[in-house]
Amino acid sequence: KRQGLGRKLESLRWGFVPNWYRTVNAGPLLINARSETIAQKPAFANASRERRCLIPCSGFYEWSKDLEGNKTPWFIKRNDDAPLVFGGVWQEWVMKVR
């Protein structure tokens, strides 16, 4: 999070909760957004302009499916084991009380 001219490191929960959800379980948590459409999607538009972040990680999984439909996870990481960083967006979500 931006603090004045600096930055702030925080631990956050994975999964984007759109601000129109009445509860955290009102629908699926969104876990990815396409860079080509993020600014136009209602769930991400404001966050893509105002709440960007960097997400450090050691790697990530991609899944492949064979002809029988069996899925295989592939862990993608750097050869030198240095950290990777993803661009992300974040959202503060507060349950609306009626």
Predicted stretch roles:
Residues 33-98:
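A contiguous catalytic/ligand-binding core that recognizes phosphate-bearing ligands
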